[in-house]
Amino acid sequence: MSVVTLAILVVGCNQPNPEAARVQAKYDEKTGKLSQLTVDAKKDGKPDIYSYMDGTKFIRIEIDKDEDGKIDRWEYYTPAQKLEKVGVSRSNDGKPDAWAYSTAEGVLSRIEVATHHDGKVNRFEYYEKGSLARVEEDTDGDGKIDKWETWENNAIASVSFDLKHTGKPDTTIDYRKK
């Protein structure tokens, strides 16, 4: 092997691997376990995926899809590494205000929404076979459901309200044609 060839190999080995630079790992100082992976998925020098880890297991993944510095999507995982729920920021303020839950088969089953953007869920949307079937909502913030919606064929069929605060509907509007 010539000196020139050896020099080229040594210099080449000292160059950073651009693919490796896209993924950064952090380890817990006490346990030595992997605690975070940061990924530059778009290859533009800015991290856009943050994976919070317990060793080799995902706890949560946060994604800044539009790279504005605010997280847009949160994925939460069970200890068995199943996707538990997906959070999104509907107001694009970097705070989750809606969470989607799926069945074991991956079909959307429920969405919980904090309509006041305060982190407190007050609207529950239930899905059957991929379509909205019913909604329950706490409209006055007292922690009790006081509005119920039923949906049929992707259209609202009826809305019921608890205007007397008894915990049961006392007024219903039916939108179905009779």
Task: Describe the function of each predicted region.
Residues M1-S2:
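Bacterial N-terminal signal peptides that target proteins for export
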Residues V10-G12:
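C-terminal motif of bacterial Sec signal peptides marking the signal peptidase cleavage site
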Residues N14-P16:
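Bacterial signal peptide processing site
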Residues E19-K43, Y50-S51, R60:
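Post-signal peptide N-terminal segment of mature Sec-exported envelope proteins
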Residues A25-E29, Y50-G55, W74-P79, W99-A104, ...:
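Aromatic-rich beta-strand edge motifs centered on tyrosine
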Residues T31-L34, G55-I59, A80-K85, A104-R110, ...:
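A short glycine-rich beta-turn/N-cap micro-motif
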Residues L37-A41, S51, I59-K65, E75, ...:
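Calcium-binding motifs, dominated by EF-hand helix-loop-helix domains
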Residues K43-K46, E67-I71, N92-K95, H117-K120, ...:
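Acidic, glycine-anchored loop motifs typical of Ca2+
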